[in-house]
Amino acid sequence: MKAKKSGKSSGDQVAGKPVSASRSEMAEVVLPAQTNPLGKLLGGHVMHLVDIAAAMAAHRHSNSYVVTASVDYIDFRNSVSLGEIVMLKSQVNRVFHTSMEVGVEVYSENVLTGECKHTTTAYVTFVAIDEKTHRPKPVRPLILETPDEKRRYEEAAERRKTRLALRYGT
């Protein structure tokens, strides 16, 4: 499926939505219950936050319920310390038929110095679910507006190819 160039619908087609409409951000302070004995945010908690931030972007794009289908990649680059602010930014990278890939970037901010660092990158695939039948449903096209969005769109196709090859052994 190719990205639509405009948001106009023709016939039965649902109008596309720009990537910017899916962008989501969330943040929270890292508390003691979320850290390991070294005072670092637990990786499992980061994964939980990634899933929530990614789902928000998928909901915004599809205007439907979504379920997590896979986490293709998660890279922990830097740790997040107790008392820091953890910030997550997500956006839909590509739409397939009933699924969509969402990219998530995680950052930490030291509240004393203001220093921000990129800590984690993840790619999560969601399936849109019909609210009545609870079955997968088609997702509206994605409108690409910037060179970065086009790059992410192309890279998502490669990740999908790898994911499907691993899943089906081809």
Stretch-by-stretch model annotation:
Residues 32, 54-62, 126, 160:
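Generic helix-packing signal
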Residues 18-32:
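Short amphipathic
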Residues 35-48:
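A conserved, well-ordered hydrophobic junction motif at loop->secondary-structure transitions
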Residues 13, 19-21, 41, 52-89, ...:
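Hydrophobic beta-strand-centered segment that forms part of the acyl-chain substrate-binding groove
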Residues 27-30, 75, 125:
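Generic structural detector for well-ordered beta-strands
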Residues 2-8, 13-16, 24, 81-85, ...:
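HotDog/MaoC-like acyl-thioester-processing domains
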Residues 33, 37, 131-132:
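Short, ordered coil/turn segments that flank beta-strands lining enzyme active or ligand-binding pockets
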